[in-house]
Amino acid sequence: MKVILSRKGCDSDFGGMPGIIMPDDRIVYIPIPGDDFETIAYHEVNAGNGLGNLCDVISQVSLHMKMYGKKLEINPETKCHLDPDLDAGMYPRKSGWRGCFGQADAAQTVLKKAGVAEGDLFLFFGWFNRTCYKDGKLRFCKGQGIHMIFGWLQIEKVIYTHEMPV
């Protein structure tokens, strides 16, 4: 079995903000913004832990994100790229839903050449920052950023993008 560390979520170029560690230590993973091909908006994604939707939680700490290094306004229709998709409670699901994440093109080729296969384990890590309340508003605490593992997925089946039905 191989164990693969995979960085996911927002960074300084895509998203422009870390995932959120709430003052009570609840973790909020923030997927990167999506492009015009995405169908899921941040307001449709449950932030988990009784916090409401991702759009509302993100808007508490910032009104903007980044996409391709450019400022992106956060509003209920802002699309997100939900990858990895690990939590059945984040979005309405069809019966039989399974956790998944996607790699395409060069990234998929790297995994194939490395012999990544059924049974291997992905550990997902990302950039997170502690928050605190300042003047009654949720804000990121300066100097409290960390990289941490936030999820995992064991490969049940590999599906190559060129083999997917259209």
Placement of each model-derived feature along the sequence:
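Structured alpha/beta reader/binder surfaces that contact nucleic acids or chromatin modification marks
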Residues: 2-4, 11-13, 19-166
